[in-house]
Design a protein with these regions (language model features):
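Active-site rim helix/loop that mediates acceptor-substrate recognition in acyltransferases
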Residues: 21-49, 56-58, 200
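Conserved active-site alpha-helix within GNAT-family acetyltransferase domains
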Residues: 88, 100, 104, 111-135
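A short beta-loop-alpha structural element at the N-terminal edge
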Residues: 1-15, 159
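C-terminal "cap" of GNAT-fold acetyltransferases
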Residues: 111, 131-209
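Conserved beta-strand in the GNAT
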Residues: 46, 52-62, 69-76
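Acidic/histidine-enriched, beta-strand-rich ligand/metal-binding domains
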Residues: 73-74, 82, 116-120
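Short alpha-helical
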Residues: 9, 53, 112-116
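Conserved acetyl-CoA-binding loop-helix of GNAT-fold acetyltransferases
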Residues: 77, 83-96
Length: 209
């Protein structure tokens, strides 16, 4: 599979070849690129095989130096790419690109319709957001999607303490902002919210400062 970017004109040409739900999903993605004015700075990433596009993704790297974060949204796999591991490979390539650019973590809101995909990767969640998606903010490295298997067995405390102090404090504030007031429980996809809060109130579990 070839991992590359498309400019706006090429993506719109591709978009116009789609039908049904694929067309509708792609149209939403186009609206996001337009709204964020991201066509030049963060053009669509695509996976291509034999001239056929198997997966499309919006990604953005934000922050400076050691605080760079990979944002992922709208991993879109059209009918022609389903059942081929395209979405997994797309996310893997996104992470490798981001790590090479200096990113140390990934942040995304996981829609519940896509949780089966993220669960298989070993992803864990800090809690439920106001939009009822599961919030993920985890460290990444040059192992790509395999890095999630490493964090699966780590406690929330271990994950937070794996970051440099200045980044750790920002992570804590962001997690609190995203999930503090939304304690909805999903027993099939449990979150780290209670364990995360315990880090602040249990003398045995102290976040390193």
């Amino acid at each position: 599979m070839i991992y590359k970017t498309l400019d706006k004109n090429d993506y719109l040409k591709y978009h116009n070849t789609l039908i049904g739900k694929d067309f509708k999903f792609s149209k939403v993605a186009i609206g996001m690129w337009d709204f964020m004015k991201a066509w030049e700075d963060w053009p669509p990433r695509v996976l291509e095989l034999n001239g056929n596009i198997l997966s499309v993704c919006f990604m953005k790297i934000s922050g400076q130096a050691k605080s760079k974060v990979l944002f992922i949204s709208n991993i879109f796999t059209p009918a022609s790419g389903r059942g081929k591991g395209s979405a997994r490979e797309m996310l893997h390539r996104n992470i490798l690109e981001a790590v090479e650019a200096g990113a140390t973590s990934i942040r995304l809101d996981c829609n519940k319709s896509a949780l089966g995909f993220y669960d298989k990767l070993g992803m864990t969640y800090w809690g439920t957001t106001i939009s009822h998606s599961m919030f993920c903010d985890l460290p990444i490295n040059d192992k790509g999607v395999e890095c999630f298997k490493q964090t699966t067995n780590m406690s929330s405390l271990e994950i937070l303490n794996s970051y440099p102090q200045e980044l750790r404090n920002a992570k804590i504030k962001w997690i609190m902002k995203k999930v503090k007031k939304h304690k909805e429980f999903d027993f099939e996809h449990p979150s780290r919210y209670n364990e995360f809060m315990k880090c602040f109130f249990d003398d045995k579990n102290t976040i390193t400062t």
